[in-house]
Amino acid sequence: MSGGGTETPVACDAAQGGKKRDSLGTPGAAHLIIKDLGEIHSRLLDHRPVTQGEIRYFVKEFEEKRGLRELRVLKNLENTIQETNECLLPKCRETMECGLGETLQRLQAANDSICRLQQREQERKKVINDYLTASEKRRLVQWEEFVSGQPQRRAEVDEEHRRAVERLREQYAAMEKDLAKFSTF
């Protein structure tokens, strides 16, 4: 690999038919060497195409497997929904209609009895309130009569007291006279 001029033919070149090879020093040969080195480098050291191919293969396989798995999940969901719509939903609806009618009847009966109880309670409260109001009015009338009759009663009691005092005076006066008769003995 000298950078010099021409090469002398080697014995093996002459033996091959006398065809002369390009020398390593010519510009075309350097270009071929660089091209060969680039191919060797890309094959040995540049793994981008291989990596990209592997990535594409992995993504394709992943999407296929994932797609199948999701398809199975969706199919199972569809079967479950169809089974629910065909079997469970009519049974639930029928059970609900049977039980709901009976429940509504019970609820209506309970509601009616509660309304009756509430009405009785309101009537009882009204009777009690009316009685209390009437009693209060009677007591007020009685109180008014009592208060208005007090001066007359007081006058009667005072008169009675005056008479009793007068009688007691007369009695004590009579007793003093009797005592005076006995004390002179």
UniProtKB/Swiss-Prot annotation:
Detected in heart, brain, spleen, lung, kidney and testis. It comes from the Eukaryota. Keywords: Acetylation. GO terms for cellular component: axon cytoplasm; BLOC-1 complex; microvesicle; transport vesicle. Residues 1-25 are annotated as: Disordered. PANTHER family: BIOGENESIS OF LYSOSOME-RELATED ORGANELLES COMPLEX 1 SUBUNIT 5. Belongs to the BLOC1S5 family. Octamer composed of one copy each BLOC1S1, BLOC1S2, BLOC1S3, BLOC1S4, BLOC1S5, BLOC1S6, DTNBP1/BLOC1S7 and SNAPIN/BLOC1S8. Component of the biogenesis of lysosome-related organelles complex 1 (BLOC-1) composed of BLOC1S1, BLOC1S2, BLOC1S3, BLOC1S4, BLOC1S5, BLOC1S6, DTNBP1/BLOC1S7 and SNAPIN/BLOC1S8. The BLOC-1 complex associates with the AP-3 protein complex and membrane protein cargos. Interacts with BLOC1S4, BLOC1S6, DTNBP1/BLOC1S7 and PI4K2A. This is Biogenesis of lysosome-related organelles complex 1 subunit 5. It comes from Mus musculus (Mouse).
